[in-house]
Design a protein with these regions (language model features):
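Short, glycine-/small- and polar/acidic-enriched structural segments
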Residues: 80-89
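Exported/periplasmic ABC-transporter solute-binding proteins
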Residues: 2-30, 44, 51-52, 63-64, ...
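Conserved beta-strand core positions
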Residues: 7, 34-36, 89
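Short, well-ordered coil loops that connect the C-terminus of an alpha-helix to the N-terminus
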Residues: 32-34, 56
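A short, gly/pro- and small-residue-rich
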Residues: 73-81
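Periplasmic-binding protein-like
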Residues: 57-61
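Short glycine-enriched, charge-decorated loop/helix-capping segments at active-site entrances
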Residues: 45, 54-55, 78
Length: 180
């Protein structure tokens, strides 16, 4: 019998449901001597945790910025980096919402807009880039609620704490309480 091994997986919060509900159980079924312990947060916060000593065997970042920083700082060997997954941003509303917002074109109608904090949350960085590209980011500053990770943004919209939010498509699909 093989010795049991525990791997630490550090992954963007947007990937938690996918890993916990599907990938980890399947991996552990195929590899009964290996247990996977998931640590989920924004990629920026995970980068900091790794720099401060988190021993992650695998790191799934939502953006190249954090991965590149860890490679530059020699926490990760560049030959071990693989671009494996991709996602896209979507605008969501709660299923029970009364907002008139139907898409990015009329996002200014929202009273509150939840996005990830662009300083540490890749989805927030991408949301800022998209809204800047549309010429809207600065004009909407007073409406933003900045989440610590994409799951927090999703939960704010699902609970009607925010009119709309910008999250990854996979997160929107994982919640029955929001619509794209």
């Amino acid at each position: 019998q093989q010795e049991e091994v525990t791997l630490t997986l550090a992954a963007a919060a947007s990937l938690e449901n996918t890993f916990e509900d599907k990938l980890i159980p399947e991996f552990e079924k195929e590899n009964p001597n290996i247990k996977v312990q998931g640590v989920y947060d924004s990629s920026g916060k995970l980068q900091i945790q790794i720099e401060q000593g988190l021993k992650a065997d695998v790191f799934f970042s939502a953006a190249t910025k954090q991965m590149n920083a860890l490679v530059d700082e020699k926490y990760i060997d560049s030959k071990d980096v693989i671009n494996l997954l991709e996602n896209k941003l979507v605008l969501i509303t709660g299923k029970q919402t009364t907002t008139e917002v139907k898409g990015f074109a009329d996002i200014a109608k929202a009273e509150t807009i939840a996005i990830g904090n662009p300083e540490v949350v890749p989805a927030g960085q991408y949301a800022k880039m998209a809204l800047t590209h549309l010429g809207l980011y600065d004009a909407l500053t007073s409406k933003y609620s900045l989440g610590g990770n994409v799951t927090e943004v999703l939960n704010w919209v699902a609970s009607s704490s925010s009119d709309v939010g910008i999250v990854y498509s996979t997160d929107a699909k994982s919640s029955k309480d929001v619509k794209v």
